[in-house]
């Protein structure tokens, strides 16, 4: 039985690799992501072609002092565009655009408006044939996705398991022990 640390605990590629959360350009300014990471393929050191940004947003209709209110989905599209342009020189050089990694910007909305509570929406690029029946392979244009996860309960929407899990995990109405118990009993999740 080996006792060398490299033999007993061999290197395993991480499934998730954290990235720098600051994206700074001279002409476009700075974007500070809450969390950004690359997803890795299981059982290999190769990266999956996914870059994921995760944002926790308290205000569902944020206000910019100069310009007034804006929509989170539009900010998510901008974040995706920045994550794509930041790949030049890293994921691809010159005109090797086929090497662009798909990006996701996922927004966990803590206090959405009442009608948005419990909603899970996804926004992405889609092909529309305006004339003719030619089709491009989806992998060539499916490069960005914005997802809004709106917490809270809504009697008009059947609660998804993900929203139920996040509602419990992030609840400010439950004690730590109550959260632990509910997460384990309802979702089989053991919090440490």
Predicted regions span which residues?
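Elongated, amphipathic alpha-helical interaction scaffolds
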Residues: 1-192
């Amino acid at each position: 039985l080996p006792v060398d640390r490299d033999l007993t605990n061999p290197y395993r590629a991480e499934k998730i690799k954290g990235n720098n959360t600051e994206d700074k350009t001279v002409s476009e300014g700075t974007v500070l992501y809450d969390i950004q990471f690359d997803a890795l393929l299981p059982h290999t050191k190769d990266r999956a072609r996914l870059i994921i940004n995760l944002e926790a947003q308290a205000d569902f209709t944020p206000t910019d002092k100069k310009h007034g209110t804006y929509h989170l989905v539009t900010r998510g599209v901008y974040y995706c565009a920045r994550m794509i342009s930041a790949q030049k020189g890293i994921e691809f050089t010159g005109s090797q655009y086929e090497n662009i990694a798909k990006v996701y910007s996922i927004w966990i909305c803590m206090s959405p408006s009442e009608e948005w509570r419990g909603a899970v929406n996804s926004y992405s690029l889609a092909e529309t044939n305006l004339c003719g029946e030619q089709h491009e392979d989806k992998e060539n244009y499916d490069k960005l996705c914005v997802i809004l996860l709106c917490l809270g309960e809504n009697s008009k929407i059947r609660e998804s398991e993900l929203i139920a899990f996040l509602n419990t995990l992030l609840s400010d109405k439950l004690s730590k022990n109550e959260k632990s118990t509910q997460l384990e009993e309802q979702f089989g999740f053991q919090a440490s």
